[in-house]
């Protein structure tokens, strides 16, 4: 597949279009056909490099992903192949005490797509099924890609933390 990668930290001249292996998914993972990936400030920081933080190279940037599920390996997910999704870019273990109370970002194993893990500046992105959020056709992929960080933050607070249920306001 084609992807925009960096081989070292630096300016925009370090962004390179390259052929890279298509990700292979395991149980409870999905392969998302990336339709749009917004530029997030985190992508710039990652490209430029941050003192004390090592990023695996070569690296695919892009944390704000919108796309369509191309392949999914899950027996319990309601999301199926062809579903339009945005991706919650923060990946946690799901089993530690912080994850159990909804504080995923405090997980010792917390990673972000496009930062510690390969992201969405590619034709496909490998994503945990639990990080997929199905979205409507009301907006374009480009519009959805512009809002994962804000959308996911608001969704997390309403659904996970406040436990808002259908019909409640």
Describe the residue ranges of each PLM region:
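Nucleotide donor/acceptor-binding cores
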Residues: 1, 83, 167-169
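Terminal peptide-recognition signature
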Residues: 3, 34, 154
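Short polar catalytic/cofactor-binding loops
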Residues: 7-11, 37-39
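Short glycine/threonine/proline-enriched tight-turn/helix- or strand-capping micro-motif at secondary-structure
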Residues: 12-21
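Glycine-rich beta-strand-centered segment in the early N-terminal region that forms part
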Residues: 21-38, 50-100, 136-139
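Cytochrome P450 core scaffold surrounding the K-helix E-X-X-R motif
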Residues: 41-47
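NAD(P)H dinucleotide-binding glycine-rich loop of Rossmann-like/cofactor-binding domains
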Residues: 91-169
């Amino acid at each position: 597949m084609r992807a925009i990668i960096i081989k070292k930290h630096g300016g925009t001249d370090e962004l390179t279009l390259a052929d890279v292996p298509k990700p292979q998914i395991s149980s409870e993972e999905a392969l998302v056909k990336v339709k749009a990936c917004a530029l997030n400030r985190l992508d710039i920081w990652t490209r430029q490099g941050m003192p004390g933080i090592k990023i695996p190279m070569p690296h695919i940037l892009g944390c704000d992903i919108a796309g369509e599920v191309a392949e999914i390996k899950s027996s319990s997910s309601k999301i199926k192949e062809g579903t339009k999704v945005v991706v919650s870019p923060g990946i946690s273990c799901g089993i530690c005490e912080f994850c159990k109370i909804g504080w995923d970002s405090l997980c010792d194993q917390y990673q972000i797509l496009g930062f510690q893990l390969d992201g969405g500046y590619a034709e496909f992105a490998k994503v945990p099924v639990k990080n997929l959020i199905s979205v409507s056709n009301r907006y374009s992929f480009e519009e959805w890609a512009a809002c994962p960080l804000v959308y996911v933050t608001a969704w997390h607070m309403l659904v996970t933390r406040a436990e808002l249920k259908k019909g409640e306001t």
